[in-house]
A protein has these predicted regions:
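Glycine-rich, proline-tolerant flexible connector loops at the mouths of alpha/beta enzymes
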Residues: 32-59, 113-119
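Active-site beta-loop-alpha junctions enriched in small/polar residues
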Residues: 6-10, 33-37, 74-77, 113-115
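Conserved beta-strand positions in the central sheet of alpha/beta enzyme cores
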Residues: 31, 71-73, 109
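Residues that form or flank phosphate/diphosphate-binding pockets in enzymes
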Residues: 13
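Catalytic domains of carbohydrate-active enzymes, especially glycoside hydrolases
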Residues: 16-38, 103-107
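Active-site acidic/histidine proton-transfer and metal-coordination neighborhood
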Residues: 17, 56-57, 61-64, 78-156
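Short hydrophobic interaction/assembly module
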Residues: 51-73
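Extreme N-terminal starter segment of soluble prokaryotic enzymes
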Residues: 1-4
Length: 156
């Protein structure tokens, strides 16, 4: 077993400083944020994907620290009812997947997302109670019309 940490706990520090602190604490692995609510304080996938030099520098910095990546974190809401927000979170996820491939990281942590309660929704809304019966219609919409189709498409 290895001890890891979600690297965003030190998002106010430069990557090198954060890695040094983690190493001094006995941490062996990190889960850096790559977008969404996790932010991109230490890893900006679009920058690393666009620049082989930046990617190489990141890998060298990580290797020099003695730490490894357990997973990449991208906790957004790609099914947000606001199409602009949904697209931004979707792009973060796509870039995180591409970066994981480049880094040889086989795990990404994310949120499935929270759609609205109908096509006209402006805000995410998740039903937590099975009654009244209208709530079951909302859940059916969220699962059958939004979440399942989104993730089936994303997986391809």
């Amino acid at each position: 077993m290895k001890i890891g940490v979600v690297a965003n706990v030190l998002q106010d520090r430069p990557l090198e400083d954060a890695l040094k602190i983690f190493r001094e604490m006995g941490i062996e692995q990190i889960e850096p944020g790559c977008g969404g609510f996790a932010g991109k304080a230490h890893v900006a996938p679009e920058r690393l994907l666009a620049s082989p030099e930046a990617l190489e520098e990141f890998q060298q910095t990580l290797q020099a620290s003695g730490l490894t990546i357990s997973a990449l974190s991208c906790h957004g809401n790609p099914v947000h009812p606001d199409p602009a927000k949904a697209e931004e979170y979707h792009e973060d996820m796509c870039n995180t997947v591409r970066l994981a491939e480049k880094l040889g990281v086989d795990t990404i942590t994310c949120f499935s997302g929270c759609p609205g309660d109908c096509e006209a929704s402006r805000y995410p809304n998740w039903v937590t109670c099975a009654w009244p019966d209208d709530n079951l219609d909302i859940l059916k919409y969220q699962w059958d019309k939004v979440l399942i189709p989104y993730w089936k498409s994303f997986a391809q």
